[in-house]
């Protein structure tokens, strides 16, 4: 199968390329980045994996729709208008969008929703994420997804408190979200459900970025066999 990696020169783009070269499923692997535009491509891909930058989204969506190519989006840091554009594209081609491609992280998404649904208003909720010092967006896309899953379990949206300083007593019902940046941390996420008597922690730590590359390739194998629509990693992993 012919694979196009959008954002080949980036860390994840390189990892996906290396992983794909070891998998006989992929007969042709090409890449697009600032130095290698789509005009240089020799073949029309059968699936695209995008790990680039929010500013590149319009280009990848236009190309995928123009050629009718299924698309996997692993880029994070999107604004509301980006997500709306992805929703529109999914009306024309199969699109799989995920803030995290690992099996373990997607299990965590499912678990925090369940815990939130069980505890409801019986706990203060704090989400902590840690990444390497080169990560551009904060909070991480995965932390945003964790909060979304928690709110789904609660059955309501909550105020989000990003960090704390000065005189700021905790408001009842708010969800605290905290980002740590340092060194070469691959990715750590933890949801804390805290009350006066006990704390429930649900956490995940990635040891190697290749886990995201493998997940992206599995997502690509999945999305090529799907009809037009918007999909997520829980669909790939059967967690729906």
From Swiss-Prot:
* Pfam families assigned: DapB_C (PF05173), DapB_N (PF01113)
Q: Which residues does the annotation say bind (S)-2,3,4,5-tetrahydrodipicolinate? A: 132, 141-142
| Signal in keyword set | no
What InterPro entries would the database entry show?
DapB_C, DapB_N, DapB_N_CS, DHDPR_bac, NAD(P)-bd_dom_sf
* Location(s) in or outside the cell: Cytoplasm
GO BP annotations, alphabetical order: diaminopimelate biosynthetic process; lysine biosynthetic process via diaminopimelate
Amino-acid positions noted as binding NAD(+) in the UniProt annotation, renumbered to this chain: 7-12, 74-76, 98-101
Q: Which reaction does it catalyse?
A: (S)-2,3,4,5-tetrahydrodipicolinate + NAD(+) + H2O = (2S,4S)-4-hydroxy-2,3,4,5-tetrahydrodipicolinate + NADH + H(+); (S)-2,3,4,5-tetrahydrodipicolinate + NADP(+) + H2O = (2S,4S)-4-hydroxy-2,3,4,5-tetrahydrodipicolinate + NADPH + H(+)
- Gene Ontology molecular function terms on file: 4-hydroxy-tetrahydrodipicolinate reductase; NAD binding; NADP binding; oxidoreductase activity, acting on CH or CH2 groups, NAD or NADP as acceptor
Q: According to its UniProt record, which protein family does this protein belong to?
A: Belongs to the DapB family.
> What is the designated name of this protein?
4-hydroxy-tetrahydrodipicolinate reductase
């Amino acid at each position: 199968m012919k694979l196009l990696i959008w954002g080949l020169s980036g860390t994840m783009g390189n990892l996906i390329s290396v992983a794909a070269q070891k998998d006989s499923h992929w007969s042709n692997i090409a890449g697009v980045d600032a130095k290698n535009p789509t005009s240089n491509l020799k073949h029309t891909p059968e699936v695209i994996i995008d790990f680039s930058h929010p500013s590149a989204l319009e280009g990848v969506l236009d190309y995928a729709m123009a050629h009718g190519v299924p698309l996997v989006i692993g880029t994070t840091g999107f604004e509301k208008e980006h997500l709306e554009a992805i929703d529109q594209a999914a009306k024309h081609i199969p699109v799989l969008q995920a803030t995290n491609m690992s099996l373990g992280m997607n299990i965590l998404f499912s678990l925090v929703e369940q815990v939130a649904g069980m505890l409801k208003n019986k706990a203060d909720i704090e989400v902590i994420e840690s990444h390497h010092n080169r990560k551009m967006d904060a909070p991480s896309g995965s932390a945003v997804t964790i909060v979304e899953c928690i709110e789904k379990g609660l059955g309501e949206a909550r105020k989000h408190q990003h960090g704390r300083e000065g005189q700021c007593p905790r408001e009842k019902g708010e969800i605290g979200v905290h980002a740590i940046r340092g060194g070469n941390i691959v990715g750590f996420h933890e949801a804390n459900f805290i009350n006066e008597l006990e704390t429930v922690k649900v956490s995940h730590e990635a040891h190697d970025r290749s886990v995201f590359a493998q997940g992206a390739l599995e997502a690509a194998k999945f999305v090529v066999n799907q009809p037009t629509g918007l999909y997520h990693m829980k669909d790939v992993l059967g967690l729906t």
